């Protein structure tokens, strides 16, 4: 089996995606691969113990010997805008505007294109890196892939078209990407 550079583990809730993602990262690390476990951060505003589950994941990964990255939409957006405009200050200002925050929430799939861009950018910058995304559900993973294609089709010119073109080209590279759909052995799971 040849190793890929980018793996997504997805499926219904409660089927063991996180356990399998962590186990796969542990396997890669034991085989001397530079592995990064990626998850969507819990961005909900909580009481004192914010993001307890995220901290537990990070601690578990650290105990197993690999790095983690919690994807935060506003941080990824700010980084993307700063790279395009060559200005951290302007990017900080833009993402704090109510207009930008509404725009991200209003346009279906935009957040997933931003996340996909962040992951692929890291993989291009570091050719030794293997990324393992623990996707919360199959809908999220599918939206991430479809949105990249949809935005590429909608914008026939400009920065977004160029960036999504690069993303699609990278995803279609042979032996680059693998989608792992985790399901319970039931008829319902097979039909879905």
Predicted features and spans:
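Phosphate-binding P-loop
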Residues: 1-4
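Short hydrophobic/aromatic beta-strand immediately N-terminal to the Walker A/P-loop
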Residues: 7-8
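P-loop (Walker A) phosphate-binding loop of NTP-binding proteins
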Residues: 12
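Conserved catalytic-core segment of NTP-binding enzymes
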Residues: 15, 19-24, 30-31, 36, ...
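Charged, low-complexity, helix-prone segments enriched in Lys/Glu/Asp/Gln
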Residues: 28, 76-80, 84, 96, ...
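P-loop/Walker-type NTP enzyme "switch/lid" segment
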Residues: 42-121, 136-150, 173
